[in-house]
Amino acid sequence: MFPWMTALENACFGLRMLGAEPGEREFKAKELFSRFGIAGWESAYPHQLSVGMKQRVATIRGFISRPDLLLMDEPFAALDAQTRMDLQQELLEMWGNSGVGVLFVTHDVDEAVLLCDRILMLGGKPGTIVAEAPIPLPRPRPAEMAMDAEFLNLKRHVLAEMRRLRD
């Protein structure tokens, strides 16, 4: 986030670069601030926001311009468990309703199985795709799904594949 911009200005940055009118971009951003549970923080600067709030603003900034593909590189790694679960569910909802493709990078197998339709495992130098695991779980995917037998079987399969690749 740009430290000299408010949370709203940061969220609207991509739309601003695309030439969207100020009223249009602020309307879209404020709607997403409400949806992501951070309404009322639009005027705050990054140093005034928690790590979770900053991640929500970054997620809004990514989705607001509706790109064809959004790269998310370990966006939840530094978050506490509750905030991570909340943001995972918010991401799943946004993702499902937006039509935006997401390339999600994570080292967390549970997170990958919950969020992704397909897991690609990388190895070697430079990193190349060495294995793939489709995730045929139905959507929507509530956090409680992580306790279902099918989820746990998929997780076991991914972990076994990772062990196989390591050996």
Show where each model-derived region lies:
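Conserved signature/switch motifs of ABC ATPase nucleotide-binding domains
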Residues: 44-47, 65
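Helical segment within the ABC ATPase nucleotide-binding domain
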Residues: 84-98
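Catalytic Walker B motif of ABC-type/P-loop ATPase nucleotide-binding domains
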Residues: 70-73
